[in-house]
Amino acid sequence: MFTIALPKGALLEDSISIFKRAGLDFSDALEENNRSLTFESNCKRAKALLVRNGDVPVYVSYGQADLGIVGYDVLRESELKVAKLLDLGFGGCHMSLAVKKNSNYSKPTDLPANCKVASKFTKTARSYFDELNIPVEIVHLTGSVELGPITGMAEAIVDLVATGKTLQENGLIKIDDIFYSTARLIGNPLSIRLDDNHLRDTILSIESINAL
């Protein structure tokens, strides 16, 4: 039996759907009154751990899970050693740079030198501004980063944007897209190397489904 780390939240339903099509049914995790964090598949070939999206690469990297599904945004930010297996295509959103709508900034180079930029994704934000050779101070927030510009603490934010509705409702506007993030299938490198074909069969099944 192998272990899969499934992400709570927006990616969960599609993650369970793709594993179900590959022969591993963890539908119990979607039940409204469910409080369990571990599930066995209907065929007893695998079990799933229900974890926060940001923790998926941690469980996979440390070997507590053999496979996992995680957003590319989290995977890129974590920098943990995992096997990057497949782009699953769902859960799409942009990692974007946004500012107050009534500001004078229409592109990244308009931002003043050494201004503050709020983000949950500090490594991503730092890498982005370093590549542009723009000196900024990155302010790490774990909650609603939109409050950074609203309160005047930051000139801009780097955050995930799906529909743009949250930005609009808070008087913010995108001025650049950094990358496009989708759900990714990842694996523990040692688990894959020592696999007795159970993991490989599941990966190949998902690859075939994903190609349709």
Swiss-Prot record:
CDD domains: PBP2_HisGs (cd13595). Gene3D superfamilies: Periplasmic binding protein-like II. InterPro entries: ATP_PRibTrfase_cat, ATP_PRibTrfase_CS, ATP_PRibTrfase_HisG, ATP_PRibTrfase_HisG_short. Keywords: Amino-acid biosynthesis, ATP-binding, Cytoplasm, Glycosyltransferase, Histidine biosynthesis, Nucleotide-binding, Transferase. The keyword NADP does not apply. One of its GO terms (biological process) is L-histidine biosynthetic process. It comes from the Bacteria. Its EC number is 2.4.2.17. GO terms for cellular component: cytoplasm. It is found in: Cytoplasm. Its main location: cytoplasm. GO terms for molecular function: ATP binding; ATP phosphoribosyltransferase activity. HAMAP family: HisG_Short. Belongs to the ATP phosphoribosyltransferase family. Short subfamily. Lacks the C-terminal regulatory region which is replaced by HisZ. Catalyzes the condensation of ATP and 5-phosphoribose 1-diphosphate to form N'-(5'-phosphoribosyl)-ATP (PR-ATP). Has a crucial role in the pathway because the rate of histidine biosynthesis seems to be controlled primarily by regulation of HisG enzymatic activity. This is ATP phosphoribosyltransferase. The lineage of its organism: Bacteria, Bacillati, Cyanobacteriota, Cyanophyceae, Synechococcales.
